Swiss-Prot record:
Family membership: Belongs to the SmpB family.
Keyword terms: Cytoplasm, RNA-binding
Gene Ontology CC: cytosol
Subcellular location as annotated: Cytoplasm
GO biological process, any: trans-translation
Keyword Cytoplasm: yes
Organism per entry: Erwinia tasmaniensis (strain DSM 17950 / CFBP 7177 / CIP 109463 / NCPPB 4357 / Et1/99)
PROSITE patterns: SSRP
Protein name, UniProt field: SsrA-binding protein
Function of the protein: Required for rescue of stalled ribosomes mediated by trans-translation. Binds to transfer-messenger RNA (tmRNA), required for stable association of tmRNA with ribosomes. tmRNA and SmpB together mimic tRNA shape, replacing the anticodon stem-loop with SmpB. tmRNA is encoded by the ssrA gene; the 2 termini fold to resemble tRNA(Ala) and it encodes a 'tag peptide', a short internal open reading frame. During trans-translation Ala-aminoacylated tmRNA acts like a tRNA, entering the A-site of stalled ribosomes, displacing the stalled mRNA.
Amino acid sequence: MTKKKSHKPGSATIAMNKRARHEYFIEEEFETGLSLQGWEVKSLRAGKANISDSYILLRDGEAFLFGSTFQPLSVASSHIVCDPTRSRKLLLKKRELDTLIGKANRDGYTIVALSMYWKNAWAKLKIGLAKGKKEHDKRDDIKDREWKLDKARIMKHANR
């Protein structure tokens, strides 16, 4: 009998874009694949990716990830030129792509990268259809978050 693969310790999350949830209302989320080169996969396994300043552009019926940085490893092959900030093609189904194109063309909407993670040894990117927040919306979110923490603190001390 074959042995089952043991799950690797640690989180499946590679990178998060926390700023996206602070600056945008995320209305719809999509899971996409990434078209990567070999050295990029190695740097993802080492956790050397940054998607905090990244965004998605739709061109010629395809989606591309711009602004992300994959730091090349020092042990990477010398005959391959590593470009850490190159644009990467996103792998979406035609129906999902049509939905994104239709909704992103409305005023005030954009597509942002939310998180990057491993799913069955495949690198996946979660993207979101987003609408920008105003300053008062951001303040309301901070107020709600602080009240939630205070409420939990009060309940904890009340139960003693």
